[in-house]
Amino acid sequence: AILAAVALPAYQTYTKKAAFSEVIAATGSAKTAVEVCAQTVAGAASSGAGSFAAECIQNKNGVPANTTAAATNNYIGVVTAASGAGVTVTATTATGVKSPLAASESFQLNGTRQTNGQVTWTKTCNPSDMC
């Protein structure tokens, strides 16, 4: 009984983190597309037409369209949007069948284009203990 009291919560945390890794992975294709766009399309301007934030978002220059959370994509929606002079890529969960994740858990990447065209990313997890 004591072993079960210790092992069960640890196992539940493990399975939740394993499921959350799918949320993190869902940002991969959008992140790569934003990086390619930053190298090939976006200028050095910090705002306005031709800027990283204006050119490297959903449905532009090879960045995929936003998706909504549905059964066909493991109940994970991905949104790419401008954020100031940068770009955010956010994956958010919806309540799905057999998922240990709650609705609206999310993984967000905040990208900033450097003068050499490289994109630096910072990450935010909700809940924070998933990162």
Name each model-derived stretch:
Residues 1-37:
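Amphipathic alpha-helical segments typified by the pilin-like N-terminal helix
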Residues 38-131:
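Periplasmic/extracellular, small/polar-rich flexible segments of pilin-like filament-forming proteins
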